[in-house]
């Protein structure tokens, strides 16, 4: 299975409970995994941190009809002792920000939020970006290493890190719709088991693991 890196903890915990098969997981940015499928890599299941990439692969004949199986929340993550209290604080001069690259869902969601800000506030925040990362793990890494003052990640990512980071919520009108979607890859070696695992993302051990990790229901 190829899955967005933000699902690492949840899927690592539930995969061993899948009956009848040894589930091997590969985590990376959703866009990178989609590119691999387009280049001929054939995992049995593909799960992305948005609904757009699975829909594209389905349209290209590379993925079964996608199923929405979880939701998440885009937030600002900052070090525990940070003075950042709001989205507007990120526009201050001297701030060092880490965000997702434009092609990865977390980066796309971030730019969607910034595009909704009034005046030049979004541009001023983007001017403080020092790092465009390929996945949420890269953003969290910059924060925990002290290389960034703030970053846009998913709520579940901050929960995994523990007390070293805290969450700054986005204003409700700006929150993007973060929906996770998955499908069975055309040409999968184990299509029946792949569909069974896919079902388990919405009702089963993996659905329970996702809920425990803080993901919402679709």
Regions found by a protein language model. Name each.
Residues 1-17, 31, 35-39, 48-51, ...:
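Exported/periplasmic ABC-transporter solute-binding proteins
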Residues 62:
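Active-site surface patch of divalent metal-dependent phosphodiester/phosphate bond hydrolases
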Residues 22-31:
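A short beta-strand-loop structural module common to alpha/beta enzyme folds
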